[in-house]
Regions:
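Phosphate-binding P-loop
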Residues: 187-194
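Small-molecule kinase domains that catalyze NTP-dependent phosphoryl transfer to phosphate-bearing small molecules
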Residues: 295, 323-367
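Active-site neighborhood of HAD-like aspartate-dependent phosphohydrolases
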Residues: 2-55, 194-199, 204-220
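Conserved phosphate-donor/acceptor-positioning beta-strand/loop module used by diverse small-molecule
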Residues: 287-291, 301-322
């Protein structure tokens, strides 16, 4: 479908454009001298948690807090770049007595956003745009936007299935992909040397099974070993994952060692850029399996990425998940995210229907233009 108008994007403010939670934590540490200091990872949920981090809520009722909230690093450049791609709206929840302060700060810090594009209120489901970008899970779940996108923060790590990003650059790449999905495009070339093929889909869709068969039959493909946080029921090293602790995983992300990371069903998954580059340097193709978030991260860092969504009947996926040797909580998280996963298929370059294994594999081989 061709469109003669720009995409519309609604942006949150708190913890997306301006530092809210982390700033409040900083103020709390300065005022109360906590030992050890409160960290952002202690804000592991929305609202009050019954822990010491609840002290930050005292700052949310002070005008000075909203007057001095710092703009997040890179936020101004992000809005400037986004304004060239889409029509920007602000959708922000703020107490009524501080709305004037919030509006003034937005106009001062982000002059690209027109005053009549600023909406203040908690009912973000009343805003209809192509894309919503927010860090609050409930806003993403209730959004009427065609593409609600979650900004990953410690308080939404448990969320699964919905499209989520870790950085502004990843979001801008997703906007490009969404824009391209609206336009008629010629069939893109597959497997130009060297290339990356990503099989996308929820847990239990069959993507790993298809990738394994490709790796077995076509030696020109190689899979980088990914990193994932430890699951008490799956701690053995294998050919797909290195298992690390959540603390180690976070350190790898924050140090930049991982160029791509995502959370799925409460577990972290990530890749090291040098692992991908070493395969490409050998003249081989990379094949890997990821959720849509990981796939978009790859597209941010590499130009030669083809995404293929593996679609399977929901009943079959649930049966596969229930057979997994994992915790009940893990299974529940994966099942709850299935509908959101299916919505993301339009962002992929191709779709393979996994109704029957051999037929799905044959379709994948056809898409990749491999010799049978």
């Amino acid at each position: 479908m061709n469109r003669n108008f720009r995409l519309s994007v609604a942006l949150d403010v708190d913890d997306l454009l301006m530092s809210c939670t982390e700033y409040a934590i900083q103020l709390a540490n300065e005022k109360y001298n906590f030992t050890p200091p409160i960290t952002i990872y202690e804000a592991s949920g929305w609202g009050k948690l019954g822990t010491r981090v609840d002290v930050i809520h005292e700052f949310f009722g002070k005008a000075e807090f909203y007057e001095t909230m710092p703009v997040l690093e890179g936020a101004k450049e992000f809005v400037s770049k986004l304004s060239q791609k889409a029509e920007i709206f602000i959708s922000t929840a703020v107490p009524p007595e501080f709305m004037g302060i919030r509006a003034k700060r937005i106009r001062e810090e982000f002059p690209q956003i027109p005053a009549d594009h600023i909406y203040m209120g908690a009912r973000k489901d009343k805003i209809t745009t192509d894309i919503l970008f927010d860090d609050a899970l409930h806003n993403v779940l209730n959004s009427n936007a065609q593409y609600p996108i979650l900004m990953r923060r410690p308080w939404n790590e448990e969320s699964t299935g919905m499209l989520a990003v870790n950085t502004y650059d990843e979001f801008l790449k997703v906007v490009d992909v969404i824009a391209q999905s609206y336009a008629k495009q010629d069939e893109q070339p597959i497997l130009s040397e060297p290339s990356i093929v990503v099989l996308v889909g929820p847990s239990g869709c069959g993507k790993s099974k298809l990738a394994t068969r490709i790796l077995k039959n076509y030696p020109q493909f190689e899979k980088p070993i990914s990193y994932t946080t430890k699951d008490a029921t799956a701690t053995e090293e294998n050919e797909w994952y290195h298992y690390v602790s959540l603390e180690t995983f976070r350190d790898m992300v924050e140090s930049g060692e991982m160029f791509q990371s995502t959370m799925y069903a409460g577990h972290g998954y990530g890749s090291v850029k040098s692992d991908v580059e070493s395969i490409l340097a050998k003249g081989k193709h990379v094949i890997t399996t990821m959720d849509i978030c990981g796939a978009m991260s790859l597209k941010t860092h590499f130009n030669n990425v083809t995404t293929i969504y593996v679609s399977r009947q929901k009943k079959a996926i649930i049966e596969t998940i229930l057979r997994k040797n994992s915790s009940i909580k893990d299974k529940a998280n994966r099942i709850m995210g299935l509908d959101f996963c299916e919505r993301n298929r339009t962002l992929c370059d191709y779709v393979v229907n996994f109704n029957y294994y051999d037929e799905a594999y044959a379709k994948l081989v056809e898409i990749l233009k491999l010799e049978k």
